Curated annotation (Swiss-Prot):
A Pfam match: Thymidylate_kin
Gene Ontology cellular-component terms listed: cytosol
Family: Belongs to the thymidylate kinase family.
Protein role: Phosphorylation of dTMP to form dTDP in both de novo and salvage pathways of dTTP synthesis.
GO molecular function, one term: dTMP kinase activity
Assigned EC number: 2.7.4.9
CDD domains listed in its UniProt record: TMPK (cd01672)
InterPro entries for the chain: P-loop_NTPase (IPR027417), Thymidylate_kin-like_dom (IPR039430), Thymidylate_kinase (IPR018094)
Domain of life: Bacteria
Keywords linked to the UniProt accession: ATP-binding, Kinase, Nucleotide biosynthesis, Nucleotide-binding, Transferase
Organism: Paraburkholderia xenovorans (strain LB400)
One GO BP: dUDP biosynthetic process
Residues in coiled coil: none
Protein name per Swiss-Prot or TrEMBL: Thymidylate kinase
Length: 206
């Protein structure tokens, strides 16, 4: 069986990506069902028993910037080894809520960690491995902030300033500009129906 495909959803908190994940997964399962493949849904930080334990620490405990980035990549290595790589090897498709682009956007753009440090970690952990498709949900940080304000018990990332998310968004868009062959940018200000039509188009060409 041919190797599976790896799809990631990205975007700043409040951009709406998580809202569309389950719907996208259902449509993807319909696409691959006739081939005997499955769709594995996962997330970062997390995705493994170890990752889910440390996720709580990363999201709620203040820490040194470099410690935060190192934890993200350490969890990613385990995620790749335990979940992503085995699933792709057996022909399944993997759909992840965030991956490496989030680290460049949040720890790099948002927190200001030098890009070369992140690139070194990326090469060490992933080699040349990248998603087949990254769907970036793009939204003005001010609008995203209004959406986040309704969240209960926000974590320490969701509680960041609008300026933080402006930097995070800018880094996401820079990453997308550098790799247009794998990025699809969706304007999250559109209606749910419009967004789902665009997602249907993406599924059709996978």
């Amino acid at each position: 069986m041919a190797r599976g495909k790896f799809i990631t959803f990205e975007g700043i908190d409040g951009a709406g990506k998580t809202t569309h994940l389950s719907w996208f997964r259902e449509r993807l399962e319909q696409k691959v069902a006739s081939t005997g493949r499955s769709v594995v849904m996962t997330r970062e930080p997390g995705g493994t028993p170890l990752g889910e334990q440390i996720r709580e620490i990363v999201l709620h405990q203040k820490m040194d910037l470099e410690t935060e980035a190192l934890l993200m990549f350490a969890l990613r290595r385990q995620h790749l080894a335990e979940v992503i790589e085995p699933a792709l090897a057996r022909g399944d498709w993997v759909l992840s809520d965030r991956f490496t682009d989030a680290t460049f956007a949040y720890q790099g753009g948002g927190r200001g960690l030098p890009r070369d440090k992140l690139e070194t970690l990326e090469r060490w952990v992933q080699g040349g491995f990248q998603p087949d498709l990254t769907v970036l949900f793009d939204l003005d940080p001010e609008v995203a902030s209004e959406r986040r304000s309704a969240a209960r018990d926000p974590d320490r990332f969701e509680s960041e300033s609008e300026a933080f998310f402006s930097r995070t968004r800018a880094e996401y868009l820079r990453r997308a500009e550098e790799a247009p062959y794998r990025f699809a940018i969706i304007d999250s200000a559109q209606s749910i129906a419009q967004i789902q039509r665009r997602l249907e188009e993406l599924i059709a060409i996978l």
